[in-house]
């Protein structure tokens, strides 16, 4: 089990202890720091919905350091990001790979950032199938459908032609932040908080 830091705040009623993620949530910050699976996705979705209900007009800041993971879980986060009213700022720290890259690109245009030493990876979904031949054929068809859906999402958010995205995701495609900016996955490479503040102003 991973260690979760706690922070203690002094209030008029005494001390109050938060786990670090709850404290960040108070400042409308969501942090994805693991692979994407159903449990993680449900937690992210709950936070997005809570922040919308708290203030539908105020931006949400979504920090991403993820190797990717489940496509269906990632799509659930992606659809929720599109569904809710607040605009979402995405920031890549470390890496945004596979579904992580899709979520990074899904931030509102003009509000997608990366720190300078991060890396971004796009590729096609992976599948390892077992079972009867007919079942494997069905699963393979579903992987192809998901692959096409992901390519269409990336094309939509980057402005790249679908055919180019299809070619680029056929194999692992690693990008530096500057390359990701040129590709259209992000809008800005930032060095520090001052860079972010100056862009937002």
UniProtKB/Swiss-Prot annotation:
Alphabetical list of PROSITE patterns matching this protein: CLP_PROTEASE_HIS, CLP_PROTEASE_SER
Molecular function (Gene Ontology), one example: serine-type endopeptidase activity
Subcellular location: Cytoplasm
GO biological-process terms attached to the record: protein quality control for misfolded or incompletely synthesized proteins
Lineage of source species: Bacteria, Pseudomonadati, Thermodesulfobacteriota, Desulfobacteria, Desulfobacterales
NCBIfam families: clpP (TIGR00493), PRK00277.1 (NF001368), PRK12553.1 (NF009205)
Predominant localisation class: cytoplasm
Catalytic activity: Hydrolysis of proteins to small peptides in the presence of ATP and magnesium. alpha-casein is the usual test substrate. In the absence of ATP, only oligopeptides shorter than five residues are hydrolyzed (such as succinyl-Leu-Tyr-|-NHMec, and Leu-Tyr-Leu-|-Tyr-Trp, in which cleavage of the -Tyr-|-Leu- and -Tyr-|-Trp bonds also occurs)
UniProt keyword list: Cytoplasm, Hydrolase, Protease, Serine protease
Keyword Signal appears in the UniProt entry: no
Assigned EC number: 3.4.21.92
Family matches, as CDD domains: S14_ClpP_2
List of catalytic residues: 98, 123
InterPro entries (UniProt xref): ClpP, ClpP/crotonase-like_dom_sf, ClpP/TepA, ClpP_His_AS, ClpP_Ser_AS
Organism, as annotated: Desulfatibacillum aliphaticivorans
Listed Gene3D superfamilies: 2-enoyl-CoA Hydratase, Chain A, domain 1
Similarity annotation: Belongs to the peptidase S14 family.
Family annotation (Pfam families): CLP_protease (PF00574)
Subunit field text: Fourteen ClpP subunits assemble into 2 heptameric rings which stack back to back to give a disk-like structure with a central cavity, resembling the structure of eukaryotic proteasomes.
GO CC, one annotated term: endopeptidase Clp complex
Free-text function comment from the UniProt entry: Cleaves peptides in various proteins in a process that requires ATP hydrolysis. Has a chymotrypsin-like activity. Plays a major role in the degradation of misfolded proteins.
Protein's UniProt name: ATP-dependent Clp protease proteolytic subunit
């Amino acid at each position: 089990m991973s260690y979760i830091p706690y922070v203690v705040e002094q209030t008029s009623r005494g001390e109050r202890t938060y786990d670090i993620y709850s404290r960040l949530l108070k400042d409308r910050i969501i942090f994805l720091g693991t692979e994407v699976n159903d449990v993680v996705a449900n937690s992210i979705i709950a936070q997005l919905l809570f922040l919308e209900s708290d203030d539908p007009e105020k931006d949400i800041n979504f920090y991403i350091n993820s190797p990717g993971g489940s496509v269906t879980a990632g799509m659930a986060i992606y659809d929720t990001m599109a569904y809710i009213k607040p605009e979402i700022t995405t920031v890549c720290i470390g890496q945004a790979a596979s579904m992580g890259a899709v979520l990074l690109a899904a931030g509102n245009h003009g509000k997608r950032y990366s720190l300078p030493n991060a890396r971004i990876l796009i590729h096609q979904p992976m599948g390892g199938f077992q079972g009867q031949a007919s079942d494997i054929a069905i699963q393979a068809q579903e992987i192809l459908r998901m692959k096409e859906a992901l390519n269409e999402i990336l094309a939509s958010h980057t402005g790249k032609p679908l055919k180019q995205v299809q070619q680029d995701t056929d194999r692992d495609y690693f990008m530096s932040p500057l390359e990701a900016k040129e590709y259209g996955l992000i809008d800005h490479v930032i060095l520090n908080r001052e860079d972010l503040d100056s862009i937002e102003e």
